[in-house]
């Protein structure tokens, strides 16, 4: 098989979020097999405590890199063996579905695969914080019912034989969360002591430590995995896992659709070699408020739909409320999170989190696209404008319904065009005459001699979302770009 057809799917996320289940569903849909990237499921013993997939959960899909180590061994050669397994699957015409959340093994494996010419699409599962702890607690309860205590007793016996009865919670299978937490219970059980309280406290610690480990993995995803995927230009869809009732519609279906599109060369996923046109980008300025007329929100959503239909990417101020949130969430829902880039100052991020009652890193924010947090407003403006300047033909700036901030940013890009800093189009979506006063003011400014007709024409006016795209299709009638030397 040629290197250009070496496709793999990555399913990543923290513990207890449903990676195994989704990996199986995707593998079934793309004629694939699963490669597990888990530093504990690779051990032969400890199937329950490490949440190793059961035959029923595998559902006929072959899984690799699971259960091949003895209890006291370490996965020293994991990456080399996993990359070799990728090659073998490729030779047999199977698509590898890499599933895991190991903070130590995942990135080395991905680097090894990419260096060998593999192409990858990634799906990142993010837990909803309102349900995550409860899901983990239920998972531990299920482990208990499945025979957790008996299995841990077996690991204690292995410890006696292989480690001379000296506990080492940093070695082999005994690193797994649950063993150390329930160790006092296992010791007391052997001496016929009172175990009930030790069992209760051990299970509580196991649940809490699993939850904390999941949050550590989430931080790793934010700080290491996501930047890596972005730097390597790997398409990444982030999906929020809430509960079982929303799994099929909110997680499984969009993930399978993305994986299938990627593997079978559908138009939904495309690669952009150097000689292909740059994607078209629009930067929108709009209110963080919804206004008191639903038509303003509908106009924003309409523009989001038109952007999807025309394969236009969006960069905006990163807010999740009002007009800004409406267009961002609409486009993400239709085109995926990579179609939208929100750039928000840290101060506004904290303010919005406080007002909404959500943590600034809440996974619910993923439905508004990728997010970059910057220190100040000036940096935000510079980065947003640069994305439009770097975009393909028809990229430009659009003003939607809003207040002071909307007008301030809109007039800044108009002024930058006037000064020759950029030559992109600037359009105003004048929904139901919302900006009629501004249009009249502009005419009066020309009439009074403060600007000429040429400068007045920098701003174009549209009354519909489709009209906005048509306005930006037309290059501005003049440009002063290059006339002044800007550092």
UniProtKB/Swiss-Prot annotation:
Induction, per UniProt: Expressed during infection of barley and Brachypodium.
GO biological process, alphabetically ordered: cytokinin biosynthetic process
Cystines in this chain: none
Binding site for substrate: 352, 380-381, 403-409, 415
Disruption phenotype: Impairs the production of cytokinins, isopentenylaldehyde, trans-zeatin and cis-zeatin.
Domain of life where this protein originates: Eukaryota
Pathway: Secondary metabolite biosynthesis
Pfam family, one: IPPT
GO cellular component, one term: cytosol
Chain spans, region Adenylate isopentenyltransferase: 1-266
Catalytic reaction(s) noted: dimethylallyl diphosphate + AMP = N(6)-(dimethylallyl)adenosine 5'-phosphate + diphosphate; N(6)-(dimethylallyl)adenosine 5'-phosphate + H2O = N(6)-dimethylallyladenine + D-ribose 5-phosphate; 9-ribosyl-trans-zeatin 5'-phosphate + H2O = trans-zeatin + D-ribose 5-phosphate
Keyword Transferase appears in the UniProt entry: yes
Enzyme Commission number(s) of this protein: 2.5.1.27, 3.2.2.n1
UniProt-annotated stretches for the region Cytokinin riboside 5'-monophosphate phosphoribohydrolase: 267-487
PANTHER family to which the protein is assigned, alphabetical: LOG FAMILY PROTEIN YJL055W
NCBIfam families: Rossman fold protein, TIGR00730 family
Role this protein plays: Bifunctional cytokinin synthesis protein; part of the gene cluster that mediates the biosynthesis of cytokinins such as fusatin, fusatinic acids or 8-oxofusatin, known for their growth promoting and anti-senescence activities toward host plants. FCK1 is a bifunctional enzyme that performs the first steps in the biosynthesis of Fusarium cytokinins. It first condenses adenosine monophosphate (AMP) with dimethylallyl diphosphate (DMAPP) to yield isoprenyl adenosine monophosphate. It then catalyzes the removal of the phosphoribose to produce isopentenylaldehyde.
Family (UniProt): In the N-terminal section; belongs to the IPP transferase family. In the C-terminal section; belongs to the LOG family.
Protein name per Swiss-Prot or TrEMBL: Bifunctional cytokinin biosynthesis protein
Species of origin: Fusarium pseudograminearum (strain CS3096) (Wheat and barley crown-rot fungus)
